[in-house]
Regions:
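Conserved catalytic-site region of short-chain dehydrogenase/reductase
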Residues: 79, 110-120, 163-169
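Conserved Rossmann-fold NAD(P)-dependent oxidoreductase catalytic core, especially the SDR/UDP-sugar
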Residues: 90-139
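NAD(P)H-binding glycine-rich loop region in Rossmannoid oxidoreductase-like domains
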Residues: 6, 36-98
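Mid/C-terminal beta-alpha module of Rossmann-like enzyme folds, strongest
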Residues: 5, 211-271, 286, 291, ...
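Conserved beta-loop-beta element that borders a ligand/cofactor-binding pocket
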Residues: 108, 142-167
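Hydrophobic/small residue at the entry helix of a nucleotide-binding pocket
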Residues: 14
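A conserved pocket-lining segment of Rossmann-fold NAD(P)-dependent short-chain dehydrogenase/reductase
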Residues: 179-200, 211-212, 216-217
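Glycine-rich "substrate-gating" loop/helix at the edge of Rossmann-like oxidoreductase active sites
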Residues: 132-133, 161-171, 191-203, 227-229
Length: 315
């Protein structure tokens, strides 16, 4: 049993996956914090949930006082990132520092790097994103690591690719894919489905963030979390159809259609910025993490089976 006081900001798919990983490892004093103070599902007995405004450093400090580690897994709607994400991160960072919490772990993605012309995505790439969401991610990562270097709080960042899994709906491999597969209909994706594309299983993401929190060597850096083997998107979807016992049917949206959809759907408009992910090989390298902490990502077959089961029981 681990009685450390642990705080998780955000009760979405990632925050809940961190919660699951903590419970698996015997942690007990776990608190989720989101704005309404309500959970989307029944929580384990080791976990409680509180309401809180992550943009308010004073409120954050009051909520996290006495914590051993804080996980930042909160985020606004996809189309609100540039306006609303930095204030959330700033509020959590300043509140954690004010309260004297020793460790802060941030669940991040890969947008800050921008296009890589098909070359592997690794941690030493420059922050070259030109789109607004990529720039937002870069600015937040810099602020967090600057705080670490200044000795204000120990910070570690875990970065994932496009993720999928139980509870994940608004994703490139989410609710436009798995419900259709279960019904034998065409899964809707984007770009060239015959290019390799690394996908992260959200449970592996949560476990990796907990591992970072437990290792002093993790702090002061950004790490790419472990992923199962990189497949083409077609191979990934064909595997999902096979597991579901259905015949593969894939519908891929092109860039022009995505732009047209963006005139009416805010999320589609924002996806145009990261079109490069689906129009060139997108292979993520997690070898530094594997060398430092070991890597045992869930095989896609097992992860997809668990994901399909979650969607099957959703309604």
């Amino acid at each position: 049993m681990n009685t450390h006081k642990t705080i998780i900001f955000g009760a979405g798919p990632l925050g809940l996956s961190v919660m699951d990983a903590l419970v698996e490892r015997g942690y007990t004093g776990i608190t989720l914090i989101n704005r309404p103070g309500k959970a989307p599902e029944t929580l384990p007995r080791e976990v409680n949930i509180l309401a809180g405004d992550a943009t308010n450093p004073e409120q954050v400090a009051a909520l996290v006082t006495g914590a051993d580690v804080v996980f930042h897994c909160a985020q606004p709607h996809y189309y609100e990132w540039p306006e609303k994400f930095p204030p959330i991160t700033k509020g959590i960072l300043e509140g954690v520092i004010k309260a004297g919490v020793p460790k802060l772990i941030f669940g991040d993605n890969l947008y800050m790097y921008g296009p890589t012309e098909g070359k592997p995505v690794h941690e030493n790439l420059p922050y070259a994103a030109e789109g607004r969401k990529g720039r937002t991610r870069a600015e937040m990562a810099k602020a967090l690591l600057d705080a670490h270097r200044a000795g204000k709080v120990k910070v570690a960042i875990g970065r994932a690719s496009d993720f999928y899994g139980p509870r994940v709906q608004g994703s490139a491999i989410g609710d436009r894919v798995f419900p259709a597969i279960l019904e034998g209909k065409a899964a809707s994706t984007m770009g060239n489905v015959d290019l390799p594309h690394t996908y992260t299983y959200v449970k592996d993401f949560g476990r990796a963030l907990v591992t970072l929190s437990e290792n002093e060597a993790a702090f002061g850096k950004a790490w790419h979390v472990p992923n199962a083997e990189t497949l083409t998107t077609r191979e990934f979807l064909n595997l999902a159809y096979e597991i579901a016992g259905q015949k593969p049917k894939i519908s891929s949206v092109g860039e022009l259609m995505l732009q047209i959809g963006g005139l009416f759907i805010p999320e589609a408009k924002e996806m145009v910025e990261i079109w490069y992910e689906f129009n060139e090989p997108y292979v993520v390298d997690h070898s530094p993490y594997a060398k430092a902490f070991g890597a045992h990502p869930t095989p896609h077959r097992e992860a997809i089976r668990e994901t399909l089961e979650w969607y099957r029981n959703l309604n």
